[in-house]
A protein has these predicted regions:
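Acidic (Asp/Glu-rich) sequence patches and key acidic residues
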Residues: 1-115, 120-122
Length: 122
């Protein structure tokens, strides 16, 4: 039990049932905090509404995420039991290479006209 995070893309915005995520994270609370902030900014909904929901990422989001990853200034998560926030600095270091790969992949997907989606479940 805990925070599971996923990212995938859609061609032409079409939902493909059973599609496998391209990226998976487990208890990466700083990434979750970043995504929750984006979700609230874009939708006006509470961050908790992202649970089992979807967040479309755009090039501005990805540029900010890339900057934060490169400069080790991801937002601190107040977390919760399920987020693994007690280990968020360790998770940030552990996932750094994967996070960079995610941003590079997501930018390519957007350049090809696809939609990049982030989701989570706890």
């Amino acid at each position: 039990m805990g925070l599971d995070q996923y990212a995938w893309s859609r061609e032409n915005g079409e939902v493909v049932e059973g599609a496998e995520p391209q990226f998976v994270w487990r208890k990466h609370s700083k990434l979750q905090e970043f995504m929750e902030q984006k979700f609230t900014e874009k939708t006006g909904l509470e961050a908790g509404e992202l649970n089992c929901g979807e967040l479309e990422l755009d090039s501005v989001d990805l540029a900010e995420l890339e900057h934060r990853i490169e400069n080790k200034c991801m937002p601190i998560s107040p977390g919760g039991f399920f987020y693994g926030h007690q280990f968020q600095d360790e998770a940030e270091d552990e996932y750094r290479d994967q996070d960079i790969m995610f941003v590079e992949w997501a930018k390519r997907e957007l350049a090809e006209g696809n939609t990049v989606i982030y989701s989570c479940w706890w």
